[in-house]
Amino acid sequence: GDVYKRQGQLNLPSYGNVMPNPKKSEIASRIVRGEVGGIFNIFGVDAIRQLQEVAVKESRLGIPIIVGADICNGYKTVFPIPLGLSCSWKPENIEEVARISAKEVGADGICWTYSPMVDISHDARWGRVKEGAGEDPFLGGIMAQAWVRGYQGNDLSADTTLMACVKHYALYGAAEAGRDYNTVDMSRVTAMNYYMRPYQAAVEAGVGSIMTSFNEFESIPATGNTWLLNDVLRKQWGFNGFVVSDFTAIAEMVNHGIGNSQAVGVKALKAGVDMDMIADCYHAVLKKSLEEGKITEAEIDSACRRILIAKYQLGLFHDPYKYCNPKRAAKEFLSVNNVSAARR
């Protein structure tokens, strides 16, 4: 029944290049079947508009897709890396970078960015230090809020703003020996005092979405960690946006020894992960899990509802093609104003 259509909103596949004929692509046929809530890393208004037309005109429910992309330090106009920007001690610089990025990205068909990365790290061996604001939780919190304000502005439904997605929740920068994806082992006291502030700051600034991290905390992967995703994020901090997994993170819980793909899909949904990035684990296991009573219809509904609310906030139900105006790209990309801001 309809619950399976609602489950389709929880899937975030990515198919890279869909040109020259997006409407004949594999992703288009999945959209028609109602299996896709969003896509990411597909660029350009032509391709995105065609896939959005498929969603609105050819799928049974006509629900528009949300389109995401990894934006770090600018889009067409390139700015200093986030670590460099944070060293300016000027949150207004970061806010301006995010505002300009939002205009350029929004002009290319995209409405959701996987930024900012606010992970605190004390280990220079970790390869992603450059994307954050360094070691200090207070500074990290200030800069996290500047990114969110710059991307989201005052009106998420404007075509010059993006929904931000704070990442990687949580403690991704504290991997043992700086090895990416490695285990994180620390007390809750250390976590809360030294690492968690920037995520909380982003929530206070009204960030629309949050991405889980690959690492374990207290030997439970963050993507299936109820204490992180429910007790702290939703209950303590009052986050009411939606949660997306990192790239294939749900399926990777199998490698963490949590169980088979059905077990990890159930664990992620119950912990509070609303959207499955590229693993297609939810797509593969939730129908069966519902039939077997391992999850409830209400759990699928609450995840679906959060994703639909985000699409509504972005104005996609009002105008699914609002980010797909081909004339805007020429005006926004590398404008004199943008380039002079970058040179400053």
Summary of predicted features, one role per range:
Residues G1-R344:
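Glycoside hydrolase catalytic-domain context in secreted enzymes
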